Amino acid sequence: MTVFMSDIRMAAQGGPGFGNDVFDRLLSERIIFLGSQVDDEIANKLCAQILLLSAEDPTRDISLYINSPGGSVTAGMAIYDTMKYSPCDIATYGMGLAASMGQFLLSGGTKGKRFALPHARIMMHQPSAGVGGTAADIAIQAEQFAATKREMAQLIAEHTGQTFEQISKDSDRDRWFTAQEAKDYGLVDHVITLAEGPISN
């Protein structure tokens, strides 16, 4: 079976090709937009878009704009791993709110190409998860949750230049940052004004 780029583009957007749809137009400029809670459906769309743009031109940057309260850890990690798998540099832009998994993806962009708009707010905290079932099931889930917490703290430490211990301490409760504070902390590299901000590659 032959799969064409237009088919992937259609699947990524959940509808037919470019037309007048604003998100299709953005995709044609190599701009991806995460503007909702992170779940499996959103993750599948974003992963497909990253893979599509990587296949179309592996030498050009992809811009990921983030205005998200966070969401599923596993869905977010699927996006993160696809970002790292792509041969393209992924420039990330925090706008509005980049919280929880939104913060994680923002700081996971290509070093030197992580931006925050001036009035963006960034929030970092430890991952959360509900547990249930038998006592044995709860113990297994708690062990997995602790491992995920350590893994994410280590990755954030690598992306920010902070120590693992500092990230673990700061993310124990909700930690809020202004755009400038996020830059000072290492979550982003630049704070840009609306006039300065690059819109496309």
Curated annotation (Swiss-Prot):
Fourteen ClpP subunits assemble into 2 heptameric rings which stack back to back to give a disk-like structure with a central cavity, resembling the structure of eukaryotic proteasomes. It comes from Corynebacterium glutamicum (strain ATCC 13032 / DSM 20300 / JCM 1318 / BCRC 11384 / CCUG 27702 / LMG 3730 / NBRC 12168 / NCIMB 10025 / NRRL B-2784 / 534). GO terms for cellular component: cytoplasm; endopeptidase Clp complex. PANTHER family: ATP-DEPENDENT CLP PROTEASE PROTEOLYTIC SUBUNIT (PTHR10381:SF70). The active site is at residues 100, 125. Its main location: cytoplasm. Cleaves peptides in various proteins in a process that requires ATP hydrolysis. Has a chymotrypsin-like activity. Plays a major role in the degradation of misfolded proteins. It is found in: Cytoplasm. CDD domains: S14_ClpP_2. This is ATP-dependent Clp protease proteolytic subunit 2.
